């Protein structure tokens, strides 16, 4: 049914699921679709949220274009965007006792909120190696990084920070 609603999905040559980590791919669980015409895309997500809503969230989205492919692997270029969000309320618990060491209790201490987001985007070139139903890929992108932290937006630099993925495909 979904294949009929979305023609791009109907043309998919293979699907992948696995682990992704990198500057322009994001970090976390990844899902990818590769089309028979050499185009593909990938999304990744890893949310970590505490009970007090302190959070660290990684997410990413990438477009691929296969340059050359054979039975053991492929070479490709990509264009990716990743985001990293963090929030720390600074609140913590402290164990406090009176002067006699009696009447001890936990006391909540309020801290200062630290919140920010970093975006990393750019093109990259990668190689992928296949074994049966598994693929491992290493890519070197040129990641342009910008961020917002403590009410200040800024350019954080351009860095060749690699991307890595380990995927199961069908």
Language model features by range: what are they?
Residues 1-14, 170:
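Cleavable N-terminal export/targeting peptides
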Residues 12-18, 40-42:
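Short, hydrophobic/aromatic-rich segments at coil-to-beta transitions
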Residues 16-30, 47-57, 149-156:
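Solvent-exposed loop/turn segments connecting transmembrane beta-strands
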Residues 24-26, 36, 161:
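A generic structural motif
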Residues 32-142, 163:
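Gram-negative (and chloroplast) outer-membrane scaffold detector with strong preference
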Residues 143-147:
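C-terminal or late-domain output modules
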Residues 155-170:
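Outer-membrane beta-barrel "beta-signal"
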């Amino acid at each position: 049914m979904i294949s009929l609603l979305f023609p791009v999905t109907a043309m998919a040559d293979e699907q992948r699921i696995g682990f992704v980590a990198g500057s322009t791919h994001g970090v976390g669980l990844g899902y990818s679709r590769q089309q028979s015409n050499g185009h593909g895309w990938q999304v990744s997500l890893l949310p970590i949220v505490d009970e007090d809503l302190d959070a660290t969230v990684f997410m990413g989205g990438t477009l691929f274009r296969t340059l050359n492919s054979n039975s053991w692997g492929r070479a490709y270029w990509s264009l990716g965007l990743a985001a990293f969000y963090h929030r720390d309320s600074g609140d913590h618990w402290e164990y406090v006792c009176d002067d006699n060491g009696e009447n001890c209790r936990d006391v909540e201490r309020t801290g200062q909120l630290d919140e920010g987001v970093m975006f990393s985007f750019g093109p990259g070139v990668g190689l992928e190696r296949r074994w049966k139903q598994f693929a491992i890929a290493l890519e070197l992108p040129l990641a342009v990084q910008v961020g917002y932290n403590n009410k200040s937006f800024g350019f954080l630099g351009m860095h060749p920070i690699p991307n890595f993925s380990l995927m199961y495909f069908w």
